[in-house]
Structure formats: structure tokens, C-alpha cells
Amino acid sequence: MITKEEAQKIAKLARLKFEEDTVEKFFTQLSTIMDMIDILNEIDCKDIEPLTSVCNMNARMREDAVTSSDLSSELFDNVSGNSTQLAKEVKYFITPKVVE
């Protein structure tokens, strides 16, 4: 159980401001929460293994394989117009000017 002064200190540290009529409600709710935490702390959990996953599924892993990631030749095969060759050489898309 916490005191009313402790509840006010917690509210101040959390930068919470309450009207006078809601301070009592905050104190009651915080007291209830702290009582629930005390009940949970009474449970003996020292022989219980931590839960690593909610579901017992094994991740399906794939083998890592090194592959070529230079797809620029395939990418620039789709370039059309009179700047096709230049686009393939510099590996940039050449577009009309959009902003003046």
C-alpha cells in the first residue's frame, strides 16, 4: 500500500497535474495497481524457464548463397529513346527536366 504523499510524488515525477477532485481517484487507482503487483510478486517463479516464444514454431532457415546482384544490364534493357546507349554507359536514367 502506498501513501497519498507517495502517489502525489509519483504524479509530480511523471509530470501529471490533477484537479483536487481527481487526486483521490488517482491515488485509489495507483494503490490498486500496486496491490496487484504485490500479489504477482508473491508468486514463486524461480523454477520456471523464461518463455522465448509464444508459439512453438521453428524458423525455417534457408542456406545463404552468394549470387550476382548487378542487374543493371537487365534494368537498362528497358530504356528507350535516343539516350539509351548513354544511360547504359553511365548507369543512370536520363529523364526530361521536371522542375524549372
From Swiss-Prot:
Keywords from the UniProt entry: ATP-binding, Ligase, Nucleotide-binding, Protein biosynthesis
UniProt KW Protein biosynthesis keyword: yes
Molecular function as annotated in GO: asparaginyl-tRNA synthase (glutamine-hydrolyzing) activity; ATP binding; glutaminyl-tRNA synthase (glutamine-hydrolyzing) activity
Catalytic activity, reaction form: L-glutamyl-tRNA(Gln) + L-glutamine + ATP + H2O = L-glutaminyl-tRNA(Gln) + L-glutamate + ADP + phosphate + H(+); L-aspartyl-tRNA(Asn) + L-glutamine + ATP + H2O = L-asparaginyl-tRNA(Asn) + L-glutamate + ADP + phosphate + 2 H(+)
Gene3D superfamilies linked to this entry: Glu-tRNAGln amidotransferase C subunit, N-terminal domain
Domain of life: Bacteria
Record's keyword annotation contains ATP-binding: yes
Gene Ontology BP annotations: glutaminyl-tRNAGln biosynthesis via transamidation; regulation of translational fidelity; translation
Root EC class: ligase
EC number: 6.3.5.-
SUPFAM superfamilies for this protein: Glu-tRNAGln amidotransferase C subunit (SSF141000)
Protein family membership: Belongs to the GatC family.
Function: Allows the formation of correctly charged Asn-tRNA(Asn) or Gln-tRNA(Gln) through the transamidation of misacylated Asp-tRNA(Asn) or Glu-tRNA(Gln) in organisms which lack either or both of asparaginyl-tRNA or glutaminyl-tRNA synthetases. The reaction takes place in the presence of glutamine and ATP through an activated phospho-Asp-tRNA(Asn) or phospho-Glu-tRNA(Gln).
Subunit text: Heterotrimer of A, B and C subunits.
Protein name: Aspartyl/glutamyl-tRNA(Asn/Gln) amidotransferase subunit C
Organism expressing this protein natively: Rickettsia africae (strain ESF-5)
